Regions:
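Conserved HGGG/HGGXW glycine-rich cap/lid loop of the alpha/beta-hydrolase fold
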Residues: 6-67
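Gly/Ala-rich beta-loop-alpha elbow adjacent to hydrolase catalytic centers
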Residues: 94, 98, 102
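Flexible "cap/lid" loop of the alpha/beta hydrolase fold
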Residues: 103, 107-108, 113-146
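Short beta-strand/loop motif that positions the catalytic acidic residue
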Residues: 212, 218-220
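Conserved alpha/beta-hydrolase "acid-adjacent" motif
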Residues: 225-230
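Catalytic active-site module of serine/aspartate enzymes centered on a nucleophile-bearing elbow/loop
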Residues: 241-294
Length: 294
C-alpha cells in the first residue's frame, strides 16, 4: 500500500496507474478514491492518474482532533501527494469537497498546477445560506458521532442531489451507499466540523479567484442546485475558466454520468496539454446588456 506523509505527520493512502503528466483526483465527502475508478481507468491510458483518500478516510490516517482538519490543510494535502510522487506540477481534478480543495490548491499553490478542474463546488457558499450550512454541518457531525456511518449513509444517500444517481443507476447508487457506510464516523464527523463548517465562502474569495491564471474548468450537474450560482460566480471571476453544465444530473457527476464527465474533462486536459486553452478576452466583459461595444 502506498502512502504520502503530510508535514503534520498524517499518512495519506493513494493509488496510481498509467504514465505521463500527473492527474490527481480529489474525492468528495461522501466518496473516497474508489469513486474515481471510472476516471482512473479512462485517464490512466493517457496520463499518470492518481487518486488518494483524504485525511479521516481510511486507509488514510484518521486524526482524532478536529484541529487537524481544515480547508487549508485539505489543499496542502494535495501538495503532499504531489511532492511524494516527485512531480513539479499536476492537473488537479476535484469534486464537491474535493472541488473546494482544488480551488484552494489553485489559490495557495498556483505554481504547482497545470490546470484545475473544479466540480460540484459551491454548496453553502451563498451569503444567505452560510449560517444554515454551518448549522447543518454541525448537525451532521453530531449525528455521525451519535449514530455512526450506517445510519448516516441511509439518510445522506437519498438527498435531493443524490436521487438522480438512484434513478439512473440503482446498482451504482447501492454501491455508493455501501462505500459511504464503510467510512470512519470519527473521520467524517471531524471533516464536517473542521473542513466543511469552517471553510470560507466562495463569495469571500473573489479577489483570490481573480488572481488564478492557470487553465480552469468548472463543471456541475444542472440539478445540483447549491452549486449552480457559485459555478457562475467562479466563471465570472476566474479569467481562465470555462463552465460546463451536465444536463439532468445531480451532485456526483463523475459516477452518475461517467462517459460524459470523462469526455468533458478529457477535452479540457487535451486543450491544456496542447497549449490551446484560452483566457477570456477582456472585450467579453461589458456593461452593455444588448451587446453593443462600449
Amino acid at each position: 500500500m502506498a502512502y504520502a506523509t503530510t508535514d503534520d505527520g498524517v499518512r495519506l493512502y493513494f493509488e496510481e496507474t498509467g504514465s505521463g503528466h500527473p492527474v490527481i483526483f480529489v474525492h468528495e465527502f461522501a466518496g473516497d478514491l474508489r469513486s474515481y475508478e471510472p476516471q482512473m481507468r479512462h485517464f490512466g491510458k493517457r496520463y499518470r492518474a492518481i487518486a488518494f483518500n483524504a485525511r479521516g478516510f481510511p486507509p488514510s490516517d484518521v486524526p482524532t482532533n478536529v484541529s487537524s482538519y481544515s480547508q487549508a490543510r485539505a489543499a496542502d494535502d494535495i501538495l503532499a501527494i504531489l511532492d511524494h510522487i516527485g512531480a513539479t506540477k499536476a492537473h488537479i481534478v476535484g469534486l464537491s469537497m474535493g472541488g473546494f480543495a482544488t480551488l484552494h490548491f489553485g489559490i495557495r499553490h498556483h505554481a504547482r498546477s497545470l490546470s484545475l478542474c473544479i466540480g460540484g463546488c459551491g454548496y453553502g457558499a451563498e451569503p444567505d445560506k452560510r449560517e444554515i450550512f454551518r448549522a447543518e454541518a454541525e448537525m451532521i457531525a453530531a449525528s455521525l458521532r451519535k449514530d455512526g456511518m450506517v445510519a448516516f449513509a441511509e439518510r445522506y444517500a437519498y438527498g435531493p442531489t443524490r436521487v438522480q444517481l438512484e434513478n439512473k443507476d440503482p446498482r451504482g447508487h447501492a454501491e455508493f451507499k455501501r462505500m459511504l457506510a464503510e467510512h470512519s464516523a470519527i473521520g467524517s464527523a471531524n471533516t464536517q466540523a473542521g473542513v466543511q463548517r469552517e471553510r470560507p465562502s466562495l463569495y469571500d474569495l473573489i479577489e483570490e479567484m481573480k488572481r488564478i491564471s492557470v487553465p480552469t474548468l468548472i463543471i456541475t450537474g444542472d440539478e445540483d442546485w447549491p452549486c449552480l450560482l457559485p459555478g457562475i460566480l467562479m466563471k465570472q471571476n476566474i479569467s481562465s475558466a470555462a463552465l460546463s453544465v451536465i444536463p439532468n444530473s445531480g451532485h456526483a457527476i463523475n459516477i452518475e454520468e461517467p462517459e460524459e464527465y470523462n469526455r468533458i474533462v478529457g477535452d479540457f486536459l487535451a486543450q491544456v496539454e496542447s497549449g490551446r486553452w484560452p483566457h477570456r478576452d477582456p472585450r467579453a466583459v461589458s456593461a452593455s446588456i444588448t451587446g453593443m461595444r462600449n
